[in-house]
Amino acid sequence: TWSGDGHNTPLEMIRAAKARGLKYIAITDHASPLGMLKGIKPHNYKKYIADIRAAAKKVPGIRVLVGAEVDILPDGKIYLPNYVLKELDWTVASVHTAFKQSKEKITQRIVRAMRNPHISAIGHLTARIVGRREPTLLDVPAALAAAKETNTALEINASWYRLDLNDLHCRMAKSADVKLVMSTDSHDEDAFDFAFGLGTARRGWIEARDVLNTLPFERFVKEMKK
């Protein structure tokens, strides 16, 4: 992949998604200032988009959204400039650094990211890694209110080491009428597995109708607009 964080090409991922029966997929490689990741940058984003669109044309029967998972910087700014973000079909903003900020700072950080009109969703909201990293001190109710206000979706990350949103946060999000999406966080072609995410969502009383990417593609595209 572009960032080096994944293990298969976009074409291989698209083919694997189709083989799993998916009707559409979002390719969201990393855009990050972290030195260990190459990723999407202002100088190469046009080639990134062109490469994925070219791969998508080779696999009929599945729709492909060209996206990115973009770092939320410690001050809440988004790593990529808006002129890049607006060219993407689907943009997830996530925290990958500065996990120990105060409750006030991390909440302001997430809310500021949500207010960017080009951000489609917030990924793994509390940034926890099961058994390895505690959640941030985020004020979750405040974040849910901002998500509702800004029409920003929240991710139910189905990876077994994320499960973020957790079940309680899923229930809170549903009560707050916040849009939800479920992702597999796939980093290779064998990782298209929603099982853990489905279990988490069901414990949070989430139904299929509560998750945007259960919708047909055209309705999903309409609903995801801010």
Please tell me what each predicted stretch does.
Residues 1-63, 74-226:
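Charged catalytic cores and adjacent phosphate/nucleic-acid-binding surfaces used
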Residues 27, 68-69:
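Core AdoMet radical
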